[in-house]
């Protein structure tokens, strides 16, 4: 689950992670009032969306007066902000964060994430703060420092000092940076976060260390034990179909292709998408119906796929283990009739009750294209949209 910058900073402050003073605004008048309340000669007007790279997209602006803050907020609110992380469609700005200006001496990058290669929480830091870290990682990977945390002992002060020295920090700032990292680690662990990024992390001219940004993502599988964090969820920032999928306990992620996919099992779903790409197509979604789906769940999954106007064909790829192929077939037939299917449908079934499932599809009277294997199914789906 992603949250907004202002929400991330609220959590930071609870753990003693230094942040600038800021006030949320949902209108231009609110922005003007916030700038007056902060009382600094310069304020920063920041668009609040669930994506990074806002600065380059025009979502972070300096204002030297409350009137200017009002005008900038007026321009941002309601705009479609496009960044490297939003895709070409962009995201609508519904709120802005008005923050005090600071005397910045240096901009750095600091991130905490789960490193699957080491199975450990890992700190990443770079002197290249304030720019796209993805670009730095691609062009200059040597500029990113990494420090893995032993789960048995947690984050140690020497690791903070090691990162600080690698970033070129000196004097009292080294200890301030170390304390900053320790507090961030506690927050990461306590909230079951999966990613925390601060870009930029700034060193003030007086040597202070402050989080000028906050990008926080939580592990959705752990939210059952963090009811307080659910209050931060902003459904307006999430894909409507993904919200609907959660209601049916479906794993659904919208993509930008035109071939809808319904598969059971995450591994098979990824293999299906890879095969579609391999034969020249583009998947419209990732959708795993799980191993114990019933007819109603399959119907809901089918309707979810077809709710995407970009879908020009549907590929169903099911290996029936726990899930029986005849149950899948019944769900496909029910959904196709209910939504009045108008796009080509390719179905590949294998496993438990496969012959019964194929018989149901064959006798359904629907225009269903059968396939005997994954590659053949992908080729038929791609051919159907060309």
Curated annotation (Swiss-Prot):
Requisite cofactors: Mg(2+)
GO annotations of cellular component type: cytosol; succinate-CoA ligase complex
EC number: 6.2.1.5
Class in the EC hierarchy, top level: ligase
Cofactor stoichiometry and binding remark: Binds 1 Mg(2+) ion per subunit.
Signal peptide residues on this chain, from the entry's feature table: none
GO molecular function, one term: ATP binding
Superkingdom, natural source: Bacteria
Protein family per UniProt: Belongs to the succinate/malate CoA ligase beta subunit family.
NCBIfam families xref list: PRK00696.1, sucCoAbeta
Function description: Succinyl-CoA synthetase functions in the citric acid cycle (TCA), coupling the hydrolysis of succinyl-CoA to the synthesis of either ATP or GTP and thus represents the only step of substrate-level phosphorylation in the TCA. The beta subunit provides nucleotide specificity of the enzyme and binds the substrate succinate, while the binding sites for coenzyme A and phosphate are found in the alpha subunit.
Protein name: Succinate--CoA ligase [ADP-forming] subunit beta
């Amino acid at each position: 689950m992603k949250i907004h910058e202002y929400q991330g900073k609220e959590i930071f402050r609870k753990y003693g992670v230094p942040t600038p003073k800021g006030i949320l605004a949902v209108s231009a008048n609110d922005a003007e009032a916030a700038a007056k309340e902060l009382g600094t000669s310069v304020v920063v007007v920041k668009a609040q969306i669930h994506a990074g790279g806002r600065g380059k997209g025009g979502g972070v602006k300096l204002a030297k007066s409350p009137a200017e803050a009002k005008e900038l907020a007026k321009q941002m609110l309601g705009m479609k902000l496009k960044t490297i992380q939003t895709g070409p469609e962009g995201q609508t700005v519904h709120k802005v964060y008005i923050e005090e200006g600071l005397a910045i001496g240096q901009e750095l990058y600091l991130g905490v994430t789960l490193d699957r290669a080491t199975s450990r929480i890992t700190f990443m830091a770079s002197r290249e703060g304030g720019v796209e870290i993805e670009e730095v990682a691609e062009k200059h990977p040597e500029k990113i420092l990494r420090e893995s945390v032993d789960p048995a002992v947690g984050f140690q002060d020497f690791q903070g000092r090691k990162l600080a020295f690698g970033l070129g920090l000196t004097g009292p700032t080294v200890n301030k940076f170390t304390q900053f990292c320790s507090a961030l680690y506690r927050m990461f662990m306590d909230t079951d976060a999966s990613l925390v990024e601060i870009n930029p992390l700034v060193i003030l001219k007086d040597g202070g260390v402050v989080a000028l940004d906050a990008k926080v993502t939580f592990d959705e599988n752990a939210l059952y034990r963090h009811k307080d964090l659910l209050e931060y969820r902003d459904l307006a920032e999430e894909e409507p179909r993904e919200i609907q999928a959660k209601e049916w306990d479906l794993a659904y992620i919208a993509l930008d292709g035109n071939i809808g996919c319904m598969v059971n099992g995450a591994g098979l779903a990824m293999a299906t998408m890879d095969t579609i790409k391999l034969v020249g197509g583009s998947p419209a979604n990732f959708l795993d119906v799980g191993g114990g789906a019933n007819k109603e769940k399959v119907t809901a999954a089918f309707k979810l796929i077809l709710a995407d106007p970009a879908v020009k064909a549907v590929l169903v790829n099911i290996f029936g283990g726990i899930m029986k192929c005849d149950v899948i077939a019944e769900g496909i037939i029910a959904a196709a009739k209910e939504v009045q299917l108008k796009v080509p449908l390719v179905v590949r079934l294998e496993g438990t009750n496969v012959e019964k499932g194929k018989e149901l599809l064959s006798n359904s009277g629907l225009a269903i294209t059968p396939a005997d294997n994954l590659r053949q199914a992908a080729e038929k789906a791609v051919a159907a949209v060309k």
